Amino acid sequence: GRVFIDATYEGDLAAAAGAEYRVGREGQAEFNEPRAGRLYTHWVGAVGEGSTGLADNAVQAYNYRLCLTDVPGDVIPVARPEHYDSTEFLSLAEDVRLGRTTAEDTVAGYYKGIRQISSMVALPNGRYDGNNHHLAFLSTDLPEENWPWPTSGWDWRDMYARRLRSYTLGLLWFVQNDKSLPESFRTECLRWGMARTEYADNGHFPREVYVREGRRVVGEYLFTAHDAL
């Protein structure tokens, strides 16, 4: 046909066609946006230490959206990944012990177990959509390592996808087996696994990285904070 629409996360076709695009965060000065650029806040609290308001190439962290279940007979147990490194997850043990979350105040009824590291949204047939948990300091997101993704080739993207898969399975293995965590916590997590009939041709693991943000093609108008206020 005469027209091609690039509706992908990455925008590779748009870039190959020469379309102008942006990656990362604009600085505060470019559009006079007080909350733009590199900022650290505790939810909607005051701007924290290390904030500069400057532009950077940071994009929102990626993860895998898991299909998890605790239905007996449908659970595929999590296997220890080949490149497992428990030191990546040790801070989680202290978070669990202290009941520490990203919220400024204590979260009433904060669930101890799989729901402390994964946001669990119910699906049909006893399955759950396991996503990164916004209240967890350590969850299924792998921040910063994904920053090259938008402008990299598929060799790098495939390498990162393997790394992210190993990290994700390593996290699940850690919460189910590492003795730095309370036995009750590990026992609850051990109930869960991948759904037997999902992604059976890929080790019951999702095929695609959840790419939340990539290139942003520059169009006729650029929406800024001033349009939303």
Segments (PLM) and residue ranges:
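Flavin (FAD/FMN)-binding glycine-rich loop and adjacent Rossmann-like elements that form
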Residues: 1-3, 7-229
